[in-house]
């Protein structure tokens, strides 16, 4: 949550899943009570980086309190959000689809630009926010896969351009940052998937995250090739 001159801008609104020491707990919600009625009335928009639960899972709980908050995100991200809003029976919401390279003036205080990043879910975006007090670049989750299945890479040129213009605060998501080495390209998994289908003589069960669309697509493509 960023606040300047009485206007508030939110970036992402997710949930966490409980660990073993939280028996009986389904979800861990953010402290939305920070947004009292006064602050909530001054929220100009909610910007979403991508469609994973830890970034969008709490959106329905926020919009239950004020459904008319404009929500910006990519087409896939907002499709996932809309499904959640319908499940929670929330109406009169305001979803605004954006693409990489798009800009938006939000309220009187925030100028926003969206930048393409690659991630394990398609349509992820980084968000650059410029204000009179300074600028913030929020990466969202990302990875450096130069050969992604959909050909959509992290736009390092756009990041370099923003760096030249000046970034006062760089907010970098750090999932697995403590793990040494580099993540493999999603495309590198294709031979292993193909080999598994070649060798399987009976029923084959594929387990993966439902949101890992590219991996699911590779499994479906392999199944079609093998007549399964």
Regions found by a protein language model. Give the residues of each.
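His/Asp/Glu-rich metal-coordinating catalytic cores
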Residues: 1-47, 52-227
């Amino acid at each position: 949550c960023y606040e300047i001159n009485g206007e508030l801008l939110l970036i992402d609104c997710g949930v966490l899943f409980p660990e073993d020491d939280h028996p009986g707990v389904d979800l861990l919600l953010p402290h939305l009570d920070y947004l009292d009625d006064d602050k909530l009335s001054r929220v100009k928009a909610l910007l979403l980086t991508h469609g994973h639960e830890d970034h969008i899972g709490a959106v329905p709980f926020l919009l239950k309190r004020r459904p008319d908050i404009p929500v910006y995100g990519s087409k896939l991200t907002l499709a996932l959000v809309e499904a959640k809003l319908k499940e929670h029976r929330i109406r009169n919401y305001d979803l605004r689809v954006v693409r990489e390279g798009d800009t938006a003036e939000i309220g009187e205080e925030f100028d926003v630009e969206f930048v393409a990043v690659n991630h394990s879910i398609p349509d992820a975006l980084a968000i650059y926010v410029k204000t009179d007090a300074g600028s913030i670049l929020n990466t969202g989750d990302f990875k450096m896969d130069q050969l992604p299945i959909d050909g959509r890479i992290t736009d390092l040129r756009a990041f370099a351009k923003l760096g030249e213009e000046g970034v006062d605060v760089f907010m970098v998501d750090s999932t697995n940052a403590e793990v040494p080495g580099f993540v493999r390209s999603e495309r590198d998994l294709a031979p292993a998937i193909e080999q598994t289908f070649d060798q399987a003589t009976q029923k084959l069960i594929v387990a993966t995250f439902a949101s890992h669309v590219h991996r699911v697509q590779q499994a479906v493509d392999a199944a079609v090739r093998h007549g399964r």
